[in-house]
């Protein structure tokens, strides 16, 4: 299943995780970008708007946020949220980030670029993100969030151990997958130093990286919502309902057996300034 297909299938589950995971990181990213009234913001891999909606509130009625993603079902949730919040300065657009161009309404380039938990899903992280950075005006701000090294690791190991009981050779390419683990792009940006170096190589200066500590209680409801509402869901795409239910039950049992009481969702929040 494609990345867009995986996330389209998770729209309601994805958003159920927002208050505990995507939301805190998105709010932190919008704050770290020091957005100002009237700014034009490009939010990439926007999902249901975890970082785009706080950005829209920050830039006010004279600003604009273009929130793009390949998963239109997720974007529709964001549109509903924006309408409910009376935010008229945000457009949720189903579009490919690798092809997005600055519209005529933003003639001087974006004032800020944000991407929360999305850079490792880009088809070529280095080339694709460098291109997006060039859509920002010189002196504009660039910000990303990524999992910190070790985050979600114990959770993911337990999940894939259970999945392997039913499909030892299942392929899954999410950022916490074991397939091609050492070559996954996230390996190059999961520490403060490596993330800062990477942003500098992408055309940013004055890079700052902060750690957002987030440990979510591993309740039965949350752990399964997190599986279904994230890239982990892709590993379940070939299983029927009865097998999925068995995996859910055994996964919960294994978390208890291993003493995993919290899900470590610690995140790195990085910002920089686009160089001339």
What do the predicted segments below correspond to?
Residues 1-37, 50-54, 77, 96-99:
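Conserved class I S-adenosyl-L-methionine
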Residues 3, 48-50, 184-276:
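Conserved Class I S-adenosyl-L-methionine
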Residues 38, 61-62, 136-142:
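Short glycine-dipeptide loop
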Residues 40-102:
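Class I SAM-dependent methyltransferase SAM/SAH-binding core
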Residues 59, 82, 163, 199, ...:
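Conserved hydrophobic residues forming the short capping helix/wall of the S-adenosyl-L-methionine
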Residues 98-113:
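A short acidic, Gly/Pro-enriched loop at the edge of an enzyme's catalytic core
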Residues 112-126, 148:
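A short SAM/SAH-binding and catalytic strip from SAM-dependent methyltransferases
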Residues 126, 131, 141-216, 234:
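Conserved catalytic/acceptor-binding region of the Class I
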